[in-house]
C-alpha cells in the first residue's frame, strides 16, 4: 500500500462537477492519495492510517492528530504505475478494484476511529482534484 501525502491549505475533489470531498481554506490539512497492491491487507491499511494521523508534517512540526486537521482520502491506482518498459505505463502492480476498494475504505475508517475528520473521493470514478500544496510538502508512505 502506498499513500502519497500532501500538506494543503485547501483541496476539493469533484465527480461529475459536484464536490464530493473538500478541505476548506481556513487552515491546514492533508490530502492522501492511496494506492493498493497485491498482498495488501486490513492490518497494513490500519497501520498506515495511524502513521498518517501522527505524521508531523503540519505547521510547527505538528501532526493531523495534534491539530485536528482534516484529511481528504482519494483512491489512486496510478501510484503503482510501472514505467520501466516502453512509453505506456503498466498497471499490473495495482490491486484490482474488488481488492482495493475495501482496503481504501478500511484506511479511511481507521482514520475516523483515530478521531480524524475524513472526506473522500469516489472509488473508481473519474475525479477532478484541486489542491493548494502548502510548503510544498509531499511525502510517500509505504507499508
UniProtKB/Swiss-Prot annotation:
Gene3D superfamilies to which the protein is assigned, alphabetical: D-tyrosyl-tRNA(Tyr) deacylase
Catalysed transformations (reactions): glycyl-tRNA(Ala) + H2O = tRNA(Ala) + glycine + H(+); a D-aminoacyl-tRNA + H2O = a tRNA + a D-alpha-amino acid + H(+)
Pfam family, one: Tyr_Deacylase
UniProt KW keywords: Cytoplasm, Hydrolase, RNA-binding, tRNA-binding
GO biological process, one term: tRNA metabolic process
Matches recorded under CDD domains: Dtyr_deacylase (cd00563)
Superkingdom as given in the UniProt entry: Bacteria
Disulfide bond positions: none
Principal EC category: hydrolase
Motif Gly-cisPro motif, important for rejection of L-amino acids, residue range(s) on this chain: 135-136
Main localization of the protein described in the UniProt heading: cytoplasm
GO CC, one annotated term: cytoplasm
Molecular function, one GO term: Gly-tRNA(Ala) deacylase activity
Subcellular locations according to the entry: Cytoplasm
Quaternary organization: Homodimer.
NCBIfam families in the cross-refs: D-aminoacyl-tRNA deacylase
Note: Was identified as a high-confidence drug target.
Entry similarity comment: Belongs to the DTD family.
Domain remarks: A Gly-cisPro motif from one monomer fits into the active site of the other monomer to allow specific chiral rejection of L-amino acids.
UniProt function note: An aminoacyl-tRNA editing enzyme that deacylates mischarged D-aminoacyl-tRNAs. Also deacylates mischarged glycyl-tRNA(Ala), protecting cells against glycine mischarging by AlaRS. Acts via tRNA-based rather than protein-based catalysis; rejects L-amino acids rather than detecting D-amino acids in the active site. By recycling D-aminoacyl-tRNA to D-amino acids and free tRNA molecules, this enzyme counteracts the toxicity associated with the formation of D-aminoacyl-tRNA entities in vivo and helps enforce protein L-homochirality.
Descriptive protein name: D-aminoacyl-tRNA deacylase
Biological source species: Mycobacterium tuberculosis (strain ATCC 25618 / H37Rv)
